């Protein structure tokens, strides 16, 4: 029986390779930044990191992290409720809550844990969760852990969301929660949060938003998609990460009203049974929020880069998804083509990743490019030139 198990895994791996669905992990030997070094020693320009503000290797963050270790040590060796809560953890939680316009916040090891520990803690079998079809895997998995009745609506489809809300209310749900990404990360599309909040008000539902791909750079002050959509104060729960725009290390959080956060501290299993966030990450994250609040220079640079890339790629004839975001997917359709395109781009000094099933639906393979404030206009033009050459070679564009 054990032999059959390993044989099955071997066959599955071989099938994934044969179908072009096997994900290779490429090695980076430098710090994460716009210009990186890979295993063969070559220098490439990175267009696939979540390093939106270009802060992953910023000297001010590195110095803040070092200072955090000097003052508070390397690790906590404890969960929060035993002996793993330092003053800096509370300071970061308060700063996150204030920045997001919420009453309180709670830190997790990752946003995956924040979402994984949210739904089953707050909702039960008498309740209902209505989830966008393109929500992140962490929301999907978190909802699966919950006993609440589950509904799903087509991506950003307000008519279908309203139909699901009616179903849930007619079925007698005690509490109804709408769960959505703030930005759908495979498409670079911002959720229609005004429509969601309007329907939530109409049907007396709660709204939860995972804003991992927005906080720090989306909205006038970088507060996220709820600021961009002018619904601050109308979203009940915001989850997010410290591992993308806010420094790119690790850590997640949930921000909400105080009673929600306090109940999560009492019952959320990933919070109760995971080590506290490391002091270096906490200190650097506080510094990041200070930098974001200090001015719009990095955000302005990011959006200028996104506009340049989208305009030049569209002019070259590529089909692009999304809008108004630093995620700009280049649609290719075929998984094998997406992988070959990515390999050829790396030879040209452009570092990207092909995305394909099961990460995206079959037939919708793509290269998801991500702009950074750290990119220069010259680097963006170089990337577009490489895309254009290879696109013509592979028959993607004329």
UniProtKB/Swiss-Prot annotation:
Homodimer. Its EC number is 2.3.1.29. It comes from Salmonella typhimurium (strain LT2 / SGSC1412 / ATCC 700720). Pyridoxal 5'-phosphate binds at residues 111-112, 185, 210-213, 241-244, 274-275. GO terms for biological process: biosynthetic process; L-threonine catabolic process to glycine. InterPro entries: 2am3keto_CoA_ligase, Aminotrans_II_pyridoxalP_BS, Aminotransferase_I/II_large, AON_synthase_class-II, PyrdxlP-dep_Trfase, PyrdxlP-dep_Trfase_major, PyrdxlP-dep_Trfase_small. Keywords: Acyltransferase, Pyridoxal phosphate, Transferase. This is 2-amino-3-ketobutyrate coenzyme A ligase. Binds 1 pyridoxal phosphate per subunit. One of its GO terms (cellular component) is cytosol. It catalyses: glycine + acetyl-CoA = (2S)-2-amino-3-oxobutanoate + CoA. Belongs to the class-II pyridoxal-phosphate-dependent aminotransferase family. Substrate binds at residues 136, 368. Pathway: Amino-acid degradation; L-threonine degradation via oxydo-reductase pathway; glycine from L-threonine: step 2/2. Its cofactor is pyridoxal 5'-phosphate. One of its GO terms (molecular function) is glycine C-acetyltransferase activity.
